[in-house]
Amino acid sequence: MKDSEIRKAVREGYGKIATQGNSCCAPTTSCCGGAGIAEAVSKTIGYSEEELRAVPEGANLGLGCGNPVALASLREGEVVLDLGAGAGFDCFLAADRVGKKGKVIGVDMTPEMVEKARENAANGGYKNVEFRLGEIENLPVADNSADIVISNCVINLSPDKKRVFKEAFRALKPGGRLMISDIVLLRELPESVLNSVEAYIGCLSGAVMKDAYLKAIKAAGFKQVKVVEETTFPIECMANDPTAQAIIESSGIRREDLSTLGESILSVKVSAVKP
């Protein structure tokens, strides 16, 4: 697929999620926990009950693969930039930590997501959070303006990950930090999955090898690049997800082989510093 086709597919896929409330990367029935699937998935990947209760209703769509805010060591007064902010879940958690003197900027390329995030911010009474429409490869933020860049299961969706990391580097102040949670590969995916549009939207075929991912961060200029945590991605929990069903149908993968495919996939939490 061409880069423009990938972006169009991702934008349309996440636009539907914003309006329908279904996760592309999480189950919609009882595979991972029955009712309140977004909440169940979020608990599985590291969010506490307190964090889930602290955000406006509808902010958590169950789209993440980790909890970057918990690992970011945010301080009062800091400026936080969230790449691929979605409905604002991590932004709202970050806003509580940086306080009234701080600021959180969420960037997303999907108009429906930005609209939903702004509605959530208004409903929650957040004054220190701003959502901007834009691509993470071309961030609508000034140079040297953020203290920390966070992102949660989004950069894997970009067809130009090197550009994303360069943009994150540009946006950070000297001494600024990067803390991201994302999906990477331990081994190459089957060709049928790599060529699946549905798999790309579902956070699968856009993922790259772990070493290549870390090299891209270093190539952007970051130092102290460190994998803080890594866990296997519970892809078998996608068996009832509409996107997962589309992946199965379009790629020919048998449902029972999903867990085997999951052995190729990691959720990693990576930190780095702009010197």
Listing of model-derived features with the role each one plays in the protein:
Residues 15-20, 32-33, 218-275:
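C-terminal lobe and adjacent flexible extensions of AdoMet/dcAdoMet transferase-like proteins
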Residues 34-79, 89-97:
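Conserved alpha-helix/loop element of class I SAM-dependent methyltransferases that forms part
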Residues 76, 137-148:
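A short acidic, Gly/Pro-enriched loop at the edge of an enzyme's catalytic core
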Residues 96-99, 162-177:
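A short glycine-rich, Lys/Arg-flanked "PGG" loop and its adjoining helix->strand segment in the class I
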Residues 110-112:
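Conserved SAM/SAH-binding beta-strand->alpha-helix loop
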Residues 124-138:
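Conserved SAM-binding strand-loop segment of SAM-dependent methyltransferases
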Residues 184-204:
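Short, glycine-/aromatic-enriched active-site segment of Class I SAM-dependent methyltransferases
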Residues 205-221, 225:
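Short alpha-helix
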